[in-house]
Regions:
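C-terminal region of N-terminal signal peptides and the immediate post-cleavage residues
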Residues: 21-37
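Ligand-binding "clamshell"
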Residues: 101-111, 115-130, 208-210, 222-238
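Short, well-ordered beta-strand elements
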Residues: 34-48, 65-70, 163-169
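Alpha-to-beta junction loops
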Residues: 83-92, 163-166, 182, 206-216
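Short helix-initiation/N-cap motifs at beta->coil->alpha
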Residues: 68-80, 192-204
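Periplasmic-binding protein-like
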Residues: 126-127, 133-140, 219-267
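Ligand-binding cleft/hinge of the Venus flytrap
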Residues: 55-62, 156-193
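A conserved helix-loop-strand patch within extracytoplasmic ligand-binding domains
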Residues: 111-167, 252, 271-275
Length: 306
């Protein structure tokens, strides 16, 4: 064999050895596959953005492959996304499950009962409802403090005292029993005008007197300003609204032995979500202009969940 040919053989052999070594090193150093992707969804308002980030980041920290789809839409829209497989996890309000999704007319008298009903109803369609949060966030009707004093407003029914009153709320609130329809049917507010507004514009519309009252959430940080009065709902038309993760059973099956870890991770997050905690995070985003991602990250780290 000539020196030239011998050198070529040696070089080819060295290259082959080097390639094999690199392939082995790459394989050995590669992270193990995380299994099926967990697709977390959220609705289109601040509190849901925060909840979506909390779930997504906690699951990533636990080793899951996670995709987060923010601002999918209202209950009817995001529920459809869950049942169709476009997402497989999202935070939902228990009252929304019982009333908006399943249209239940006869409802339990306790928060635990509402959650148990949601678990039972969802089981029939292949969805698991995990543990509820300590905090609750119900729809409520708020008015300007000056108007509450002027008209002597204490309950939703008192709005009948106000001539030509209008309520501003998100579009889907209009036809719900736990919304404007319930206000008309239960409290007799048949003459009230409905003004459809984007959720983010309701307080602005109230401040500018474009509407007399608005639909709010009981954990809205704006309510701490003292500018508004939340009217009591003695008939409980707005229901019980603790939050619980809804998880597709198809995802749980695909995860196999890791399904238990997903459940425990989300349950640990929910267990930390007190009224004080969610109000602080909502305020950090709305008033302090922090991002939901940053707020969620700080909360998870402070509680040993990330």
């Amino acid at each position: 064999m000539s020196r030239k040919k011998w050198r070529s053989v040696v070089i080819v052999g060295l290259l082959a050895s080097l390639t094999s070594a690199l392939m082995l090193a790459t394989t050995a150093g590669a992270a193990p596959k995380a299994g099926p992707t967990v697709i977390v969804g959220s609705k289109n308002f601040t509190e849901e953005y925060i909840l979506g980030e909390l779930y997504s980041q906690a699951l990533k920290a636990a080793g899951f492959s996670v995709q987060y789809k923010q601002s999918i839409g209202a209950t009817e829209v995001i529920d459809s996304a869950l049942t169709s497989g476009k997402i497989n996890v999202y935070p939902e309000y228990v009252g929304e499950i019982d009333q908006t999704v399943f249209h239940q007319k006869t409802l339990p008298q306790t928060a635990k009962g509402w959650w148990q009903l949601a678990v039972k109803l969802n089981k029939k369609r292949g969805i698991t409802v995990l543990n509820p949060t300590p905090f609750f966030d119900v729809d409520a009707i708020a008015v300007r403090k000056a108007d509450a004093t002027k008209y002597g407003l204490h309950t939703v029914a008192d709005l009948k005292k106000v001539p030509n009153a209008s309520v501003g709320a998100r579009p889907e609130f209009k036809d719900r029993e736990e919304g404007f329809k319930g206000m008309q049917d239960v409290y007799g507010l048949t003459g009230m005008k409905y003004v459809s507004l984007d959720q983010g514009l309701t307080y602005q519309a109230l401040d500018q007197k474009k509407v007399f009252c608005i639909d709010v959430f009981s954990t809205d940080p704006q309510l701490a300003s003292g500018k508004y009065v939340v009217l009591k709902d003695p008939k409980l038309i707005f229901g019980v609204q603790n939050v619980a993760p809804e998880v597709s059973n198809k995802l749980l099956t695909a995860l196999g032995s890791k399904a238990a870890l997903l459940k425990s991770t989300l349950n640990k997050v929910d267990a930390k979500l007190t009224q004080k905690a969610i109000l602080a995070m909502n305020s950090a985003v709305v008033n302090n202009k922090q991002t939901p991602k940053a707020v969620a990250s700080a909360f998870l780290k402070a509680n040993g969940l990330a």
